[in-house]
Design a protein with these regions (language model features):
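Contiguous, non-catalytic segments that form substrate-binding/exosite surfaces or channel walls
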Residues: 188
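Short, surface-exposed secondary-structure edge patches
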Residues: 191-195, 211
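C-terminal soluble interaction/assembly domains
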Residues: 204-268
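Cationic-aromatic interfacial patches
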Residues: 13-85
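Acidic/His-rich structured neighborhood in mature extracellular/periplasmic domains
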Residues: 57-183, 195-198, 203-206, 216, ...
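Residues that form generic nucleotide/phosphate-binding pockets
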Residues: 32-35, 50, 54, 105, ...
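Bacterial Sec-dependent N-terminal signal peptides
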Residues: 1-16
Length: 268
């Protein structure tokens, strides 16, 4: 146990010596990402340590785009983040040796594959809905149903991107009917967290969103079965904190339940 603790401290000490990622040029980022790959050969460990390096990054909602209309934001960036951008840019970066490769990997993760197997940045091909991504994107695989007995899972059916009045939530010419299982608040505890791997994704369910064709209001990463790293609009930056303390406030739970997912390398 002492050795493990020392190893964790050593990792954090090295990360603390690095310049903050949002202050770096593309060349400086490329140099440091090579060191992450060499220092942390294990995929999940590298993702965890890279995510810790992001703590403190300024928050900006909806900050990735296609660099062309209708969304001219950058395809890949390190200067700001929101909850989903933290997940996607971290996943892309840890599978890369430089800035350009991270951008290329981000495209593979953030956009649906076309009929010819290509990933082309396009607003309508983006994985806009976290629920859709967890159920069908191989980089972020839903594990919610494996964590509890069937009777402890809440289930809903909804049509993604279809509002209660039948209109689309986003102008995508796309809807999808899905069945979603999530863990209700009365089942969220330390025992549940101990069932997770050392790093796992968490997505927060908001029932009031169902009528808009949405299920997920926020997402982040659970590390070491107890802490959450997430880009927070409330804190205006990426933060690391105790998950249960964050989720259960004096006024009650922040959300109506959660989904969990695991992270996976790109194929091919």
């Amino acid at each position: 146990m002492i050795f493990i603790f020392y190893g964790c401290q050593k990792n954090q000490t090295w990360i603390d010596t690095l310049p903050k990622p949002w202050t770096l040029s593309e060349a400086e980022f490329s140099s440091i990402i090579k060191k992450f790959n060499k220092r942390y050969p294990d995929f999940n460990d590298r993702l965890k340590q890279f995510s810790k390096w992001q703590v403190g990054k300024p928050y900006k909602i909806f900050c990735l785009g296609e660099e062309t209309l209708p969304d001219v934001d950058p395809i890949f960036r390190m200067d700001v983040s929101d909850c989903t951008v933290h997940i996607l840019t971290s996943l892309a970066s840890i599978q890369s040796q430089n800035w350009n490769q991270a951008k290329s990997n981000l495209i593979k993760i953030h956009y649906k594959t076309g009929v010819n197997g290509e990933n082309i940045p396009s607003y309508k091909k983006r994985w806009h809905f976290t629920t859709d991504r967890l159920l069908f994107n191989p980089s972020t695989k839903n594990i919610t149903d494996s964590l509890l007995d069937e009777q402890d899972i809440q289930r809903i059916s909804l049509i993604l991107n279809q509002k209660q009045n039948g209109d689309e939530f986003l102008d995508l010419d796309w809807t999808k009917k899905v069945s979603v299982g999530y863990i209700p608040n009365n089942m969220i505890n330390n025992e549940l967290l101990n069932e997770l791997p050392s790093i796992a994704g968490i997505a927060f369910v908001k029932k009031s969103y169902f009528k808009m064709g949405l299920a997920i209001a926020h997402e982040g990463m659970i590390i070491d079965n107890q802490s959450i790293i997430h880009a927070s609009q409330e804190y205006e930056k990426t933060v690391l904190m105790n998950f249960l303390d964050y989720y259960f406030t004096d006024e009650g739970p922040r959300f109506d339940g959660v989904m969990f997912f695991t992270f996976h390398p790109l194929r091919g």
